[in-house]
Amino acid sequence: MAEVHPSAIVHEGTVLGEGVKVLEGAVVGKQPTLSPRSTAKREPLPPAVIGDGTVVSTGAIVFAGATLGARVIVGDQACVRERVAVADDVVIGRGALVENDTTIGARTRIQANAYVTAYSTLEEDVFVAPCVVTTNDNFMGRTEERLAAMKGPTIRRGARVGGGAILCPGIEVGEEAFVGAGAVVTKDVPAGKVVVGSPARVLRDVPEDELL
């Protein structure tokens, strides 16, 4: 049976699995309110689905159309937007924002105040450190051409992204790659490599004892 704090809001139709906890002031199943100028789709979204044993922490928001697997932790004041698919055993840290149409693989950890932009893919066992910023729009809001080209980064299995790094639109971080703190990633990162700097460049291989 799910536990919902009296101050939490769970919108009609939301599916809560066995042992789910929705803590103080959290909101689950919220339909988005769009700006008149928004290019996002406007049809009603299906209910949010929250898997067994998942915790939606104090002040967190999970929008309608989101699907969270089992044993997920959504930290205090974090936000998971519509059409996000989160696999089992994922941690979304305090104040992190996962934008719409994003996929997050099992056991991935997104730490406090990270920003995962819309149309991103994070595979299994990814680590995203605090205050990482991902982007998806090379045109920065100008021209209609941007709508067809809008794409967040793809972060492959076991890759790690250091604190404060910035990932530019559409780039791919390869399997088991390591992006150093504060790096600005403007092009694809090869699998198993360490990149640092602005713009990011390959420094060396990831040590074997750090590989999954």
Where are these regions (language model features)?
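A glycine/serine/threonine-rich, flexible loop-to-helix segment
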Residues: 206-212
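Structural signal for interior beta-strand "rungs" in well-ordered beta-sheet cores
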Residues: 2-196, 201-202
